[in-house]
Amino acid sequence: IDSTKLSLFDNASTQYVNFVNSFGTSYSTLRGDASWARDTLDSRTSPTRGIVQSAYGEMGLPGGTLHYYKINYQHQWYHPLARDYTLRLNGEIGIANGLANDPLPFFKNYYAGGISSVRGFKSGTLGPKDSNGEAIGGGRRLVGNAEKYFPMPGLGQDKSIRLSAFKDIGTIVASND
């Protein structure tokens, strides 16, 4: 059971205020979780070949005050391009929504942007914004990355430090869009 207590600031987003006005500030969520992972990488620290897959599901079950679901899937693929060059492709998708006519709790929203998803953006800044211009996240997340790893000049065969060129894409969409 997850227990959550919220406090809102004076300039809180309308989305947050509306949620608190409808559902109050204290929640007890009976949460069910399930996950699965598969890893065939040839190295933990500097992979050149293999895949990593993971899936995760979370649900606010009947018996709690919040009813929702979240489903995430990630697939990473490493492939050697040449002796010292590796291609990494990564795709992530997340879908979340409220259940039983409840909205998705705003604190369960997805976020993207930043070093772990879409580099070049500040952390968590992609997607819908509130009336103050602040990111509020959403119920849909899509992220894709392509990276080419190559050796650091002067280090020879040491793969513990590599350089990379990358391209990232991603978006966050509100639950009701």
Please describe what each predicted stretch is.
Residues D2-I161, A165-I169, V173-N176:
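C-terminal outer-membrane beta-barrel translocator/porin domains of Gram-negative envelope proteins
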